[in-house]
Curated annotation (Swiss-Prot):
Keywords: ATP-binding, Magnesium, Metal-binding, Nucleotide-binding, Nucleotidyltransferase, RNA repair, RNA-binding, Transferase, tRNA processing. Its cofactor is Mg(2+). Residues 224-324 form the HD domain. It catalyses: a tRNA precursor + 2 CTP + ATP = a tRNA with a 3' CCA end + 3 diphosphate; a tRNA with a 3' CCA end + 2 CTP + ATP = a tRNA with a 3' CCACCA end + 3 diphosphate. This is CCA-adding enzyme. It is an enzyme of class 2 (transferase). Mg(2+) binds at residues 21, 23. Its EC number is 2.7.7.72. PROSITE patterns: HD. Disulfide bonds: none annotated. It comes from Wigglesworthia glossinidia brevipalpis. Catalyzes the addition and repair of the essential 3'-terminal CCA sequence in tRNAs without using a nucleic acid template. Adds these three nucleotides in the order of C, C, and A to the tRNA nucleotide-73, using CTP and ATP as substrates and producing inorganic pyrophosphate. tRNA 3'-terminal CCA addition is required both for tRNA processing and repair. Also involved in tRNA surveillance by mediating tandem CCA addition to generate a CCACCA at the 3' terminus of unstable tRNAs. While stable tRNAs receive only 3'-terminal CCA, unstable tRNAs are marked with CCACCA and rapidly degraded. InterPro entries: CCA_bact (IPR012006), HD_domain (IPR006674), NT_sf (IPR043519), PolA_pol_head_dom (IPR002646), PolyA_RNA-bd (IPR032828), tRNA_CCA-adding_enzyme (IPR050124). The keyword Magnesium applies.
């Protein structure tokens, strides 16, 4: 029995990046021997075991052969006679097919170290095209390693573009898992740029791809898709929360192509929300993500109008986003609005003024408590009326705002 460290741990170690987890390949062994040595079997489709002490995954060397469609259309073979090189060959990219033995020696049969040095994401063989999930994985690695100037090899990108029809066979759960990982990268926008470039975006995220066919109102030479990805990037500089980053992808869903020569698009919140509901339902997203995405769609530009709307509209806005019971929504919306603003050309300094304004406004309005109104003798429907009146008075007396 011999075991080798493989995959991301070797790759990230060579790149001096943090190692998140360690995976091992075991050759010249059998399931019976692994169990006898105390390893716990956990794999359903193929023999994977947990180390009795470290609990790190150890997989018996295996090969695979295409026998169907999609990323599950494979027949797996495992045997004590399968070599390390044969196991590494079934992997997606050369940089993920480097192994390390117990003495620290590197085994690199497919040139992964050279490609790491050249910052290249390159497929190992033509068998790459047999698994459509690799389109998403390669796009994710492009996002993950973008800060190190990695790029996708042109031949690999060409193969990816030839695989897009099989994306249909990937379960939505796997699509969301890869997308979620990509959204948590330092440069999440790169993932969607790669999917756009190889034609996959239209297949799995048609709602986002459609934005690339709508010209911006602010700059006719830029489309809304590009602005959306720019906003996503800006949000990633401020927050690492998945709900905020995904919301940035949805904030332009209410924009549609216009036949009017003066305006490149028109807004329709109702249809925009229908599109949002469709993508959230398809991806089976959490209520938390859905709620913030809806707020981003409906109110991402409200902070830019805050100086020019009436007191009643300000209070309605805060009611709509449920700010009284969920104060954090103000901070989330500020991040969304700032990211949107920067994407369309606002300066950060001017947005700081609006951020300070809305925070101070909310703090004062939220200081009015229903219990104090009841103490003053108001009952029934008059409590709500008095609450509204007092909040309006604060806006009129303490803040410069339209009546």
């Amino acid at each position: 029995m011999k075991k080798y460290l493989v995959g991301g741990a070797v790759r990230d170690g060579l790149l001096n990046m943090p190692i998140k987890e360690k995976d091992w390949v075991v050759v010249e062994s059998t399931p019976e021997e692994m169990i006898k040595l105390g390893y716990k079997p956990v794999g359903k489709s193929f023999p994977v075991f947990l180390h009795p002490k470290s609990h790190e995954e150890h997989a018996l060397a295996r090969t695979e052969r295409k026998n169907g469609y999609g990323y599950k259309g494979f027949k797996l073979y495992t045997s004590s006679k399968i070599t390390l090189e044969e196991d590494l060959k079934r992997r997606d990219l050369t940089i993920n097919a480097i192994a390390k033995d117990k003495n620290g020696n590197l085994i690199d049969p497919y040139g992964g170290i050279k490609d790491l040095y050249e910052k290249k994401l390159k497929h190992i063989s033509n068998s790459f095209k047999e698994d459509p999930l690799r389109v998403l994985r390669t796009a994710r690695f492009a996002a993950y390693l973008f800060h190190l100037n990695f790029f996708i090899d042109s031949k690999t990108l060409k193969i990816m573009s030839e695989m897009i029809d099989e994306l249909f066979f990937i379960p939505v759960e796997r699509i969301w898992l890869e997308t979620k990982k990509a959204l948590l990268c330092r440069n999440p926008h790169v993932y969607f740029k790669v999917l756009l470039k190889c034609g996959a975006l239209k297949k799995i995220f048609p709602e986002i791809e459609n934005l690339f066919h709508i010209k911006s109102f602010y700059n006719k030479n830029i489309n809304l898709g590009s602005l959306t990805l720019r906003a996503l990037y800006e949000s990633s500089l401020i927050s690492n929360e998945i709900k905020i980053r995904f919301s940035m992808l949805c904030h332009n869903f209410d924009k549609f192509n216009s036949n009017n020569k003066k305006n490149s698009f028109y807004c329709n919140k109702i249809n925009g929300n229908l599109i949002l509901n469709k993508i959230c339902k398809r991806l089976k997203l959490s209520n938390e993500i859905k709620k913030l995405s809806k707020i981003a769609l409906d109110h991402h530009d409200t902070l830019y109008k805050i100086f020019f709307i009436s007191a009643k509209m300000v209070i309605k806005f805060l009611n709509d986003i449920n700010a009284w019971k969920n104060p954090k929504i103000i901070d989330d919306l500020i991040i969304i609005s700032k990211s949107y603003g920067i994407s369309i050309g606002y300066k950060k300094k001017s947005m700081h003024k609006q951020e300070k304004f809305i925070k101070n406004l909310y703090k004062k309005l939220n200081s009015i408590k229903t219990k104090d109104i009841i103490k003053d003798g108001f009952i029934g429907i008059n409590i709500k009326k008095e609450l509204m009146k007092r909040r309006e008075n604060i806006i009129y007396n303490d803040f410069i705002i339209y009546k």
